[in-house]
């Protein structure tokens, strides 16, 4: 029959449909279009390259024709290369590319493996060939190959000990007693027996995925057990649920007991600004795995349903701010500072630890979300009252995703489906069409039972029949028709370890879900939805899921059981215009929204002070030391920094690589001490003959003495190796009247070391530069001197040249060293404002004395001052 077909086609091979398509594609790709040169334009109607006489060349027309042909040649070369070469590995878009681009050849069909190996060698890609497959290995004990070797070894040992011919063939020193044959046989038998019998200590799970609830009740929970292959890597730093996915696409960092995402490998500074900034410029969303934020669930054991004892504890932790009616009864998420207290020592809530989120589920139940650096400290504080409270450590049992952007809710709605009719889910579907989240009420929380996100073959938007325009009445109904009972029921399931364990019951594997989807695809009726696996209430698990709005940071968090996060994460990142971010991008968003980022912008806390004075300082100093002598700044030889040069310091003041809050504390306390009783402030004392009094204590009579004392304290700290965690030099000012004692009352006979005993009250500010330049981290903030105020006010209005342009080359007056009032903790160019902007802290006493809100900002290692205007940031 094949012969007849060949004869009918002239002896040529009959090509199938795919071969014909490929041949036509290559033929079209290799065809090059060209413009024909016409001698006259009358016949063709097109402009000719030649003149009417035919002897001259139209240069313009000739160049345009050749330009067209060169472009067609380049296009044909590109198309021909792409059409004729078929790669085994896909050329993915940049967003989906992995960092290392390594491939496992075993996952490729056998007929393509040799070609894949050639491609990988050509492109210097890593191949995975060594190692055995884990699919054939049993759950416990030996695999089939090891079991066969053990049984064969027993038979050979028995044969060698009984066979006379084998004994004679062996050397005389090799005997059964010398080789301990019996002991080896017993050991092999024991190994086979242990492999065949099940371990009675193993707790059987309710699913085949290995998911379980890892909660510590009144104790810290252990790191969740995953694959044995990765256990050793998580000994000190636990992995988040999305670690393997993120490790291929992001730069990771190890801090605070976790391996977290620092930043994606792709450049995303402007992208983060557009999507995470204003709603008008956002056409997508950003997502971040925020499971490193630890979750504590606190319940009041007392029979009182009002939870008065829990209310008192939360009040002490948050300075009574989280106990307001809006948060406790209205179910609005509280974002603020958390404080440490110890009732035994009689300490009050004056030492802030860091930021926290508090959500009141009911009056006797609260959820506290904390940064991992302060999690253990707060957990131990709550554990002191375990007789009256039940404290659950849910660090590894509750996961969360943070979403930000105009399309955050719309993207989330395309991945989630409710198991049954839910009023909260209906409200969520209606709200998902709103891009401006500022139009929503403050109490905007959704909770419902969701199906497995893997039931959806791909993220699918809601049907047009389900979508309708949202008006003001619909938004008002969110507050009026708030389904509190329904939401409380889901929260109770989320806060119960047994309910979380039940959510993993019959959790399907990907293979099982694919088999169910294949049955749908091969079904006869076409009316059913063949891409979404239907939910079976009797067999399929349901996920208790909560979506909470955060007002301060203007984003959304999704809280769900730990092992359910990865399926949702995979589906979220398949949505167009959805990008994953890390801690670096979250800090950028906080900076652009003029919010503080923990711990970099919290120098008044213990961890923030350590971060600035140790980690960031050492990193900057190491980077500076690596530079050659000719490429690094010599901070000690910088000239013209201040108006008056004092003998105590030459060049840059304070620490060169950090915000020297200790220097600011001593300087401001010393100035207040020198100006006590309306005394005149002197920079130097020319009549002074000695530096120390009869008791060997340095006399403080002028500003130069204060600077000399700073050097003395620094030398003493290095000699005694004092801990930097103790005696934080600054404290956040809560009220207008500072609560800390000022050094105005220091007696003359007291030690000058009292200047370090009183912390300075500081306030958080955002400083926006009015002209050129942008501040950097650790930049110095100076107050505007009274004598130069007119000059800087004129500069703020603008000094123009005769041609109408601004004059930026004016000679500016320099401030004195005692005009230093603060530091910039985070500073760069603000894309939204179009100017340089920095977040920092200034001395509260100096701020309230200023007639204007203008300050001078100078970067470290420079002598250029920029005028800026500060505004207070509420903490």
Curated annotation (Swiss-Prot):
Modified sites of kind Phosphothreonine:
524
**Pfam family, any one:** POPLD
Q: Which reaction does it catalyse?
A: Endonucleolytic cleavage of RNA, removing 5'-extranucleotides from tRNA precursor
Enzyme Commission numbers on file: 3.1.26.5
Cell compartments where the protein resides: Cytoplasm; Nucleus
Q: Which residues form a coiled coil?
A: none
Main localisation? cytoplasm
Residue ranges annotated as compositionally biased, kind Polar residues, are: 39-54
Q: Which GO terms describe its biological process?
A: intronic box C/D snoRNA processing; maturation of 5.8S rRNA; nuclear-transcribed mRNA catabolic process, RNase MRP-dependent; rRNA processing; tRNA 5'-leader removal; tRNA processing
Cellular-component GO terms for this entry: cytoplasm; nucleolar ribonuclease P complex; ribonuclease MRP complex; telomerase holoenzyme complex
Its Gene Ontology molecular function terms? Answer: ribonuclease P activity; RNA binding
InterPro entries, A to Z: Pop1, POP1_C, Pop1_N, POPLD_dom
* Record key words, sorted: Cytoplasm, Hydrolase, Nucleus, Phosphoprotein, rRNA processing, tRNA processing
Q: Identify the stretch(es) annotated as Disordered.
A: 1-20, 35-54, 119-140
Please give the PANTHER family that the UniProt record associates with this protein. RIBONUCLEASES P/MRP PROTEIN SUBUNIT POP1, RIBONUCLEASES P_MRP PROTEIN SUBUNIT POP1
What does the further note read? Answer: Present with 846 molecules/cell in log phase SD medium.
Oligomer and partners: Component of nuclear RNase P and RNase MRP complexes. RNase P consists of an RNA moiety and at least 9 protein subunits including POP1, POP3, POP4, POP5, POP6, POP7, POP8, RPP1 and RPR2. RNase MRP complex consists of an RNA moiety and at least 10 protein subunits including POP1, POP3, POP4, POP5, POP6, POP7, POP8, RMP1, RPP1 and SNM1, many of which are shared with the RNase P complex.
What function does this protein fulfil? Answer: Required for processing of 5.8S rRNA (short form) at site A3 and for 5' and 3' processing of pre-tRNA.
Give the protein's recorded name: Ribonucleases P/MRP protein subunit POP1
Q: Can you name the source organism?
A: Saccharomyces cerevisiae (strain ATCC 204508 / S288c) (Baker's yeast)
Q: What is the organism lineage in this UniProt record?
A: Eukaryota, Fungi, Dikarya, Ascomycota, Saccharomycotina
